[in-house]
C-alpha cells in the first residue's frame, strides 16, 4: 500500500539490555528509507540537573522541567522515618531481590502496621511480576525489583541498593 503511514517509536539509548543482533538504526533506514526523525527531549519527570546528567550519558540534549524533583541520600533509619510519614499510594520502592528494600519493608510493617500491611502494600521480588496477572492496587505502596517496575509510577520513588557493584552484576 503506497499510502500506508508507518510510525516507528523508540530510543535505543534508553534500552537496558542489548540482546538483539539487529542493527536497529540500519534496519529503520533501509525499511523506511525516507522519513522524518523527531526528537523528544523534554522530560517532565526529571529536574534540569538530572536531565543534563542523563543527556551527557546518552550524548543527546534532554531538558528536565520538573522543579519538584528532589534527590536525597538516606540511611535505612532515615528512609523508614521518611516513609512512615507518606501515604502508601504515593510510593514506589525499587531494589534488588535481597537487600535494604526488604529490610525496610519488614521494619515498616513491624513499626507502622496500621500504615504498612498486607492491605496497603504490594510487594514482590520477582523480576517478571509486572508482566503477570497480579497488579498493584492504585492505593497500595509498591515494593518491587527494578526489572519488575516497568509501567509502574508513583509520586515518590525510593531506590535501594543501586551500587556500582550491583550495576556491574546487571550488565554482565
Task: Label each region the model flagged.
Residues 124:
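Short, flexible loop segments at boundaries between secondary-structure elements
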